[in-house]
Amino acid sequence: MKQHIPNFITCLNLVSGCIAIVFAFQHELEITVYLLALSALFDFFDGLAARALNAYSVIGKDLDSLADMVSFGFAPGAIMYIVLNDLLLAQQLPSYLAYTAFIIPVFSALRLAKFNNDTRQSTYFVGLPTPANTMFFMSIPFVLAHSAINNTFVNSPAFLISLIVLMSFFMVAEIPLISLKFKNFDWNQNLEKFLLIGISIILFVILKFVAIPLIIICYLLLSIVSKKKIIS
């Protein structure tokens, strides 16, 4: 019985992601964001449950990737399609450019397939994880709604499409990135992880959802600076 508990939690991730996509295409992006945050929690707890119960299985691993493809692949693509389509129509630009948003699910699929077959990624990640990429893009509607940011270059479809291409590259790039899996809580061994958590908390308290892109950028920069320590 216990071996089915992680898979059940994974299925909750999948259901939450499916409902998030429905709300995205209904232009209810705030609800979409909260549902994807819920998916991320389920994604965290299914792994936690698998480790706690020693309930690992090949089916569980594949199911996790399939659920992630929906919640952290197609869902962020749907968000960016809606955002881009609205901006393109408002600025009287070709609406077909919004389809560039679906670069996200394509590269998410590549990232997940790579993760499933890469033995290096037990203690660190190689390339940006799909949940982190989803966090980045699910914050975009909040960033665009922020009064201090609206009507800046961030509101440009060209800028957002460039972000889609750049973040998709990071998902499949051969860049070692910090994993927040702790073997112990030794300060020296986990300095980068503690720094990342501390910076994230401070930024989120100050800026709320608008902080998420900055947190992901800090994550990438801190990982690149700490590359030698991560892979050692």
Residue ranges and their predicted role:
Residues 125-232:
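C-terminal membrane-associated helical module and adjoining short loops/tails
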Residues 7-10, 52-113:
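Multi-pass membrane catalytic core of lipid/isoprenoid biosynthesis enzymes
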Residues 18-21, 38, 76, 106-109, ...:
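Alpha-helical transmembrane segments of polytopic integral membrane proteins
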Residues 1-14, 51-69, 112-132, 176-191, ...:
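Interhelical loop and helix-boundary elements at the membrane-water interface
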Residues 1-44, 204, 215, 226, ...:
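Topogenic membrane-insertion module of multi-pass membrane proteins
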